[in-house]
Amino acid sequence: MKIDAGLDTGAVYAMRTVPMDDDVTLEELRARLVEVACTLLVDELAHGLAGLPEPEPQRGQPTIAEKISREDLHLDWSRTAVELKRVVRLGHAWTTFRGKRLTVLEAAVAAEESRTDGRRPGALAGTLVATGGGSLELRRVQPESRSPMSADEWLRGVRAGDGERLGTD
């Protein structure tokens, strides 16, 4: 990008499209973008020895995203499973269980809702959590002051009762 006075307004020397699926996390996307950017930079510098191409003006308006706060990463179980999965994909999503912080590292929207039907948001049914719309399946978690582990390992360790709720503390 050519340096310009405005924020993200300079003309572009080169760009690449990076495909992204619905399950990619922020960390995975960051790693993929670094790899693509490094390759693009090396390729363009090699071409630059013969003279840089004329930069093309950017299309459209820049998108400005607000900074993500700690509260934005708090899992509000009254939201839908799809919305909560998006928060988990950002990384460092958290809730509480028995007064302690529980970071949710990996989760999926559950195909099976019957085990959580009629339960209050945050209620556990094994690795499934009832939400405001659908169920979220916990896959990997990190309890406060502990190492990451599978949700099954965590549930065995805390001996969570069926229907016990997350996020009530």
Where are these predicted regions, by residue range?
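Internal anion-binding site segments
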Residues: 59-169
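Donor/substrate-binding cores of folate-linked one-carbon enzymes
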Residues: 1-64
